[in-house]
From Swiss-Prot:
Pathway: Amino-acid degradation; L-arginine degradation via ADI pathway; carbamoyl phosphate from L-arginine: step 2/2
Name of the protein this chain belongs to: Ornithine carbamoyltransferase
Residues the record lists as binding L-ornithine: N166, D224, S228, M229
Enzyme class: transferase
């Protein structure tokens, strides 16, 4: 073990270097193998993970809670509706208190500025479980799933069909760091915000008006719900706007013959993806969902213990 010399947070995908991701992806495979072989591994014995949820989730809570347990620690669930965070306690104060009683903190919230402010006042590592702007743990799991199924992602093409949401912006950061092409297609009014795309990422990002063309030659086609949490009032308008951006078998046929399909779930069959695609032979959504568990274990282990 080579413990970290200072506190490190994971708030955006760009917070880690290529070399760190190479380590984390390798480590994820090792920890997954331990899990499959029923091998006990408790590097986080008696460590406590605080899980703060302002946005509800099934996969995020289950994967983090099971993950810290499998590493020998335990989790404390904090819902903002049931804590002082939901009664107006300043974020800075909450960070000071919670980080004095726990070893690592995961937050799933709305604005990115909330988690940035929290981390700035935390004495322990903070992990972004999801914000409106970024979802780094999910994209890390997706990349691990791709590598597991198809090998290195460098030089490959990842196509995003759908809203410019937290997943899309995280894929933009990942493309620059890991060196793959990112094809993006969404209807007008739902495009990538130039202010959210670094100039250094532009050579890796290619925007298409036609979603079929965006899928040409893709090694991975991925999407998400048309209406993210917090945007429910726009649901009907989004359904009308995104009608041509459902991932279909025709789109998958434009991709590479061995292309994969991913969706971070939950999915709405018949909206953002055809049932024949998500339930078809190219879909790896269940492996993708499971791999949240393994990459997050590698992440927590790295943030608290450094490298093995």
């Amino acid at each position: 073990m080579n413990p970290p010399s200072s506190i490190k947070h994971y708030l955006q995908f760009k917070d880690f270097s290529l070399e760190e991701y190479e380590y984390l992806l390798d480590r994820s495979a090792i920890l997954k193998a331990k899990f499959k072989n029923y091998e006990t591994w408790h590097p986080l014995h008696d460590r406590t993970l605080a899980m703060i949820f302002e946005k509800n989730s099934t996969r995020t809570r289950l994967s983090f809670e099971a993950g810290i347990h499998q590493l020998g620690g335990h989790a404390v669930f904090l819902n903002t509706r049931d804590s002082q965070l939901g009664r107006g306690e300043p974020i800075e104060d909450a960070a000071q208190v919670i980080s004095r009683m726990t070893d690592i903190i995961m937050i799933r919230t709305f604005g990115q500025e909330i988690i940035e402010r929290f981390a700035a006042h935390s004495r322990v590592p903070v992990i972004n479980g999801l914000t409106n702007e970024y979802h780094p743990c999910q994209v890390l799991a997706d990349i691990f799933t791709f590598i597991e199924q198809r090998g290195p992602i460098k030089g490959k093409t990842v196509t995003w069909v759908g809203d410019a949401n937290n997943m899309a912006y995280t894929w933009v950061q990942a493309a620059e760091i890991l060196g793959f092409r990112f094809h993006f297609s969404a209807p007008k009014g739902y495009q990538l915000d130039p202010a959210m795309v670094a100039d250094s990422a532009l050579p890796f990002v290619h925007v298409f008006e036609n979603p079929l063309e965006a899928c040409d030659g893709a090694h991975l086609v991925t999407t998400d719900v048309w209406t993210s949490m917090g945007y429910e009032a726009e649901n009907e308008a989004r359904k009308k706007a995104f009608g041509d951006w459902m991932v279909t078998e025709a789109m998958m046929q434009r991709a590479q013959p061995d292309a994969l399909f991913m969706h971070c779930l939950p999915a709405h069959r018949g909206e953002e993806v055809e049932a024949a695609v998500i339930d078809g032979k190219q879909s790896v959504v269940w492996d993708e969902a499971e791999n949240r568990l393994h990459v997050q274990k590698a992440l927590m282990e790295y943030l608290l213990c450094g490298r093995y």
